[in-house]
Amino acid sequence: MNRAQNAPQPSKLTRNLGLQGRNTFGFDASAELAYEITSAEQIPEVMESIAAQKLSWRVLGGGSNVILPKVLPGATLLMNITGAEITSSNQEHSLVAVGGGVNWHDFVLWSLDNDLPGLENLALIPGTVGAAPIQNIGAYGIEVADYIDSIEAFDAHTDSFVTLPKSACHFAYRDSYFKQHPHRFIVTKVVFKLPKQWQARIHYADLANQFAANATPCPEEIFLAVCKIRTRKLPDPKVIGNAGSFFQNPIVPNEQHETLLGKHPNLVSYPDAPGKRKLAAGWLIDQCGFKGERMGNVGVYENQALVLVNHGGGTAQDILGLAKCIQEKVRKEFGVSLEIEPNIL
């Protein structure tokens, strides 16, 4: 077979592509140059073109964890690599390879349909599979890092494809090696390691309350419970623009936690690493009176103070202005700094 027949289909290039439907805040934004990536083989040629033109670049997946400006200059790579397959299986676990552009919730559904439990606590988290490890998404007591075997990516520093084992990913709370080195890696595939000996993880308060009378729920029951809780607490981005949790839960030393607890007996917190506690950012924001408040076209969600929303017509500048007000008030009231979770592009 000749080389022309083996050559990958060229990436589709669109100029001034509207991105309002590709970011969950629903901001009216556009990409100066947008490259649609449907296979890993397209990336070297695209990156060569970007380098030749000396363009800035970034990857955009589901747009669920980003704050977009009016115009994204340079090149935007739209991650649309699909596919999911079980690559190996033994008595202990199954390895599942998933394309970076696959919708995260769709993959969770696929895993349960294929009798591969483990990810049910992460149901309904918006975004793509490729973005999940970058942020190390987590919810209801687990993180995606708990189930990752390795990650395949294009390294823009070496112009080559690499496979990073879990140990090289430096996963931490909402953090990873990929997040620490922005504009370097383009995640094309994530390999998950899902255990055959599944155990329910329902110690998180909201889930524990759901199963007070059922100590041994099945994966599907946990999946449905998580969906129910998230639907009740979090707004649907298709109805009202948002990026889910806007601030990370701050982690403080035990000494600072004890001081805060003395002043605020109802302080909500959770155990973290030895000698540290994780504070509930939503509770801090609520105590400062922001829950349900509106500032122009943006505001704080009425059912969850951790979520900032775009009521329509809002901009990145608007949402960041509101975020700054919240950060300043929380710092003044509690002496705690809140870190923004979405990436500001």
Swiss-Prot record:
PROSITE patterns in alphabetical order: FAD_PCMH
GO BP term, example: cell division
One example GO MF annotation: FAD binding
Positions annotated as active site in the UniProt record: 174, 245, 341
Required cofactor(s): FAD
Annotated EC: 1.3.1.98
Places the protein is found: Cytoplasm
Pathway it works in: Cell wall biogenesis; peptidoglycan biosynthesis
Known catalytic reactions: UDP-N-acetyl-alpha-D-muramate + NADP(+) = UDP-N-acetyl-3-O-(1-carboxyvinyl)-alpha-D-glucosamine + NADPH + H(+)
Stored SUPFAM superfamilies: FAD-binding/transporter-associated domain-like, Uridine diphospho-N-Acetylenolpyruvylglucosamine reductase, MurB, C-terminal domain
Keywords: Cell cycle, Cell division, Cell shape, Cell wall biogenesis/degradation, Cytoplasm, FAD, Flavoprotein, NADP, Oxidoreductase, Peptidoglycan synthesis
Cellular component aspect of the GO annotation: cytosol
Coiled-coil intervals, chain numbering: none
Domain of life: Bacteria
Pfam families xrefs: FAD_binding_4 (PF01565), MurB_C (PF02873)
Domain FAD-binding PCMH-type: 27-197
Chain's role: Cell wall formation.
Family according to the record: Belongs to the MurB family.
Annotated protein name in UniProt: UDP-N-acetylenolpyruvoylglucosamine reductase
Organism: Polynucleobacter asymbioticus (strain DSM 18221 / CIP 109841 / QLW-P1DMWA-1) (Polynucleobacter necessarius subsp. asymbioticus)
Source taxonomy: Bacteria, Pseudomonadati, Pseudomonadota, Betaproteobacteria, Burkholderiales
